[in-house]
Amino acid sequence: MPSIILPPKPTALQKPHINLAVVGHVDNGKSTLVGRLLYETGYVDEKGFKEIEEMAKKMGKEDFAFAWILDRFKEERERGVTIEATHVGFETNKLFITIIDLPGHRDFVKNMIVGASQADAALFVISARPGEFETAIGPQGQGREHLFLIRTLGIQQLVVAVNKMDVVNYDQKRYEQVKSEVSKLLKLLGYDPSKIHFVPVSAVKGDNVRTKSSNTPWYNGPTLLEVLDTFQPPPRPTDKPLRLPIQDVFSITGAGTVVVGRVETGVLKAGDRVVVVPPAKVGDVRSIETHHMKLEQAQPGDNVGVNVRGINKEDVKRGDVLGKVDNIPTVTEEIIARIVVLWHPTAIGPGYAPVMHIHTATVPVQITELISKLDPRTGQAVEQKPQFIKQGDVAIVKIKPLKPVVAEKFSDFPPLGRFALRDMGRTIAAGQILEVKPAQVQIK
């Protein structure tokens, strides 16, 4: 039986590739919109979808059918139907777009940081429904938090889908109100709202997703798929040394150890001699696969499964980084970073010990020193050695990981040089690494 979400078609793999993060507050319609995008682009199994639709009808929940595509897919994944299927994708005219970290995940914000460090662009879904919109961008709203995050993670390409237009009877006034409020927030974050497309959509009904809707005669901009089609794939840093943060490790009968992750920089080829750090285990690349197809070489942006000889599954874990033996990824003893405090109920001082999420790693850390506080607008220091920093502050700090972890300077390897600090179930700060003090690594 085919998976509910179809694998990439041969045409897709010929197209430039973009990783898209879908963000927004819970219940604003992210899953439904993703399901709708996959359906409209021919990436949903027709027979499977008919079953889902019938089931939704019987239960009187017709509006849930598109969201249930993702639920069905998650079930397939949990039953171990596919390994590579953590990523789903669809095609536009010019691009193949992979959706990273499907919405609705419990650790979505954390994964946004780890996952969005892999995103080239973001789709922000905001509901026009009264109450839902106000909650989403309010002080405690996830919508607001997600926008802060994608900004901190350096994602420049953004489209805003104003969803559930059917619920507000396609009211232009409500759309303009939502657009104006979100624009204010984007401006505050340093985006230029005039350069960002807002599209009034209904994920349930399909308005303005693939085709222009007659329900919104007052809107004459592009459809959502047309906007996505304008996104530019980022330059892929093939000339840098190899860095591949590990997302998952499997042991496959007859094949040995397979590490799964995304190549962030450099090029990986079959036959390469590689090292995984912090554990400092060395092995040889037997083969590389993406979406069930063998690759001779993997480049930045490729999500791959790498079959490695000489390394056991027990030796490596999510958060380790694969590199080549002639340029070993940096295991760090201490870092100096610029952070922005996104949320904290009181104040942060030296000795504060949150958890750092960096690329695919999660590690307890301690802020050992507050070096200076900066003016957020100019980046100039306004206070040396402040006693504390609070929400909204930008500061340069010294951080000590309490366990071995790979971290690089943001200027050398951006995806391994940006991180989030979490505590109390919330994202406290996001940052970029300015300096790294390397730890000694003995290759085994």
Swiss-Prot record:
UniProt domain tr-type G: residue ranges: 15-236
Keyword Iron-sulfur: no
Keyword entries, A-Z: Cytoplasm, Elongation factor, GTP-binding, Hydrolase, Magnesium, Metal-binding, Nucleotide-binding, Protein biosynthesis
Any single Gene Ontology cellular-component annotation: cytoplasm
PROSITE patterns found in the cross-reference section: G_TR_1 (PS00301), G_TR_2 (PS51722)
Ranges where the record places region G1: 24-31
Reactions the enzyme catalyzes: GTP + H2O = GDP + phosphate + H(+)
Molecular function per GO: GTP binding; GTPase activity; translation elongation factor activity
InterPro entries the UniProt entry points to: EFTu-like_2, EFTU-type, G_TR_CS, GTP-eEF1A_C, P-loop_NTPase, T_Tr_GTP-bd_dom, TRAFAC_GTPase_members, Transl_B-barrel_sf
Chain residue ranges for the region called G2: 80-84
Ligand binding (Mg(2+)): 31
Gene3D superfamilies attached to this UniProt entry: P-loop containing nucleotide triphosphate hydrolases (3.40.50.300), Translation factors (2.40.30.10)
Annotated positions binding GTP: 24-31, 101-105, 163-166
Keyword Metal-binding: yes
Residues covered by region (G4): 163-166
Region (G3): 101-104
The EC number(s) this enzyme carries: 3.6.5.3
Sequence segments annotated as region (G5): 202-204
Top-tier EC class: hydrolase
Subcellular location: Cytoplasm
Disulfide topology: none
Family membership: Belongs to the TRAFAC class translation factor GTPase superfamily. Classic translation factor GTPase family. EF-Tu/EF-1A subfamily.
Entries under NCBIfam families matching the protein: EF-1_alpha, PRK12317.1
Functional description taken from the UniProt entry: GTP hydrolase that promotes the GTP-dependent binding of aminoacyl-tRNA to the A-site of ribosomes during protein biosynthesis.
Protein's UniProt name: Elongation factor 1-alpha
